[in-house]
Regions:
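Intrinsic-disorder/low-complexity signal
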Residues: 1-194
Length: 194
């Protein structure tokens, strides 16, 4: 049974978890803006200073595989329609380089400014972390669930959670921190240039 977290709560990951499926889901509210919503999940592999060490430490729809294959994005869902996970990221903890101390899992709205969209128009957003046996196991056993209940009226990017290493143990931090400026703002925040 999964542990349900609230914003700011932290929990240790199961010691036996070698691979994790990170599933993200959401619904978009109907509105009369004329544009479809395209939300995108991404992951940033971070060093001790909270910054990416290399460009390939940024995993998103144009770079699906992170360094050493440690983090793999399962592809961009352009509509977010349907039940269940809208986008999935798989983490293989055995492949994460030693210098990586944290993985930030984020969601952004593609072309948010031009489309006049923000996270205030998104509902039922969640993240779940499941223990999986291999990269083909897309169900797994849920360990953690975090429902984002906060209202984000102007934000176009969210840091949903951080999976971080402390004293050799991987932990989960329910962050839910909003940004204006979309993906570009997150990229700069994590030490990369656009």
């Amino acid at each position: 049974m999964a542990v349900n977290l609230q914003k700011g709560q932290r929990v240790s990951l199961d010691d036996s978890m070698k691979m994790a499926l990170v599933g993200l889901g959401w619904d978009t509210n109907r509105y009369d803006g004329g544009f479809d919503f395209d939300l995108d999940a991404s992951a940033f592999l971070l060093g001790a200073d909270g910054k990416c060490l290399k460009d390939e430490d940024f995993i998103f729809y144009n770079n699906l595989n992170g360094r050493n294959g440690a983090v793999v994005h399962q592809g961009d869902n352009l509509t977010g329609e349907g039940e269940g996970d809208d986008e999935v990221i798989v983490i293989d903890f055995s492949k994460i380089p030693d210098e990586i101390q944290k993985i930030a899992i984020c969601v952004t709205i593609h072309d948010a400014v031009a489309r006049r969209q923000n996270f205030g128009q998104v509902s039922n957003a969640y993240i779940r972390v499941a223990k999986i046996a291999n990269e083909f196991d897309m169900a797994g056993e849920d360990q953690i669930r975090f429902d984002l209940e906060e209202e984000f009226s102007i934000e176009t990017a969210l840091v949903v959670c951080e999976i971080y290493k402390k004293n050799g143990e991987w932990k989960f931090n329910a962050v839910a921190s909003g940004f204006q400026g979309g993906l570009e703002a997150l990229v700069r925040n994590y030490g990369l240039s656009c």
